Regions:
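Short, acidic loop-to-helix structural element flanking the phosphoryl-transfer center
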Residues: 79-107, 117, 144
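Acidic, Mg2+-coordinating phosphoryl-transfer loop and its flanking beta/alpha structural elements
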Residues: 162-201
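Conserved Lys-Pro-Asp/Glu-containing loop-to-beta segment of HAD-superfamily phosphomonoesterases
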Residues: 5-6, 143-171
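Active-site neighborhood of HAD-like aspartate-dependent phosphohydrolases
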Residues: 1-45
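A short, structured active-site edge motif that brings together acidic residues
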Residues: 43, 125-141
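Conserved phosphate-coupling serine/threonine residues in phosphotransfer and NTP-handling enzymes
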Residues: 14, 109-111
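Helix-loop "lid/cap" segments that line or gate small-molecule binding pockets
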Residues: 29, 50-64, 119-122, 150-151
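Metal-dependent phosphoesterase signature
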Residues: 56-93
Length: 211
């Protein structure tokens, strides 16, 4: 019998392989402002939420450019690179295997919800999820609050739910919502940071030991 009845997935960095696109986006933004660029390793060591604090740490002047302006810049620049986006390895197979053993699957993302649904449809995996819940803004904020609203309307028992993410913040979200948590090391945070918060996997197909 499965240990969990529900899996709540993060999207960016967990199911979607967008770390390189994210770093390229930030480096273009930094370069236009004559700021120091980031390596992938530096990015994964430093990226976090709230995003405004991360932006400040890597050199953006939030007094000259408030979060709204930087967020618009990030979205438009990210979209230039988005044509190269793919799913992480084994995603369709892992999702199908979970469905076959009767576990319900959901997405909880900081991505704006309409964009999340568009991306799920473009990768033809939207039917694999019972519900996909995203943000109502472009600032990557409010993931815990969105999760709380999700729990209010869906028949999900937190104690029977595992969250799979790729950031320290995903572990914080899982804790706040009462979910179990496993973190994927191939996403937006370094493995050493993730290990301080939850069990980790280096490949999504290795998640099966947690069911």
């Amino acid at each position: 019998m499965a240990r969990y009845k529900n899996i709540v997935w993060d999207w960016n960095g967990t199911l979607l392989d967008d770390v390189a696109v994210g770093v390229d986006t930030l480096n273009e933004m930094l370069g236009r402002r004559a700021l120091r660029l980031l390596s992938v390793e530096e990015y994964k060591d430093r990226f976090g939420f709230p995003v405004v604090e991360f932006y400040q740490k890597i050199g953006f002047d939030m007094e000259k450019e408030p979060l709204h302006e930087l967020s618009l810049d990030f979205v438009s620049t990210y979209n230039k690179y988005a044509t190269s986006l793919e799913l992480n390895s084994d995603v369709p197979e892992v999702l199908d295997n979970i469905r076959q053993i009767g576990i319900k699957q959901y997405i909880l993302s900081a991505l704006r919800e309409d964009l999340l649904h568009q991306m799920l449809q473009s990768f033809d995996i939207d039917a694999r999820f019972d519900k996909a819940c995203g943000s109502d803004n472009i600032y990557a904020t409010g993931k815990i609050e969105r999760g709380q609203r999700m729990l209010e309307v869906l028949d999900i028992c937190p104690a029977e739910t595992l969250m799979v993410g790729d950031t320290v913040h995903d572990a914080e979200v899982a804790k706040a919502l009462g979910f179990g948590c496993v973190l994927f090391t191939g996403g937006h945070n370094s493995e050493w940071r993730l290990r301080e918060k939850a069990p980790v996997v280096r490949q999504l197909k290795d998640l099966e030991r947690f069911w």
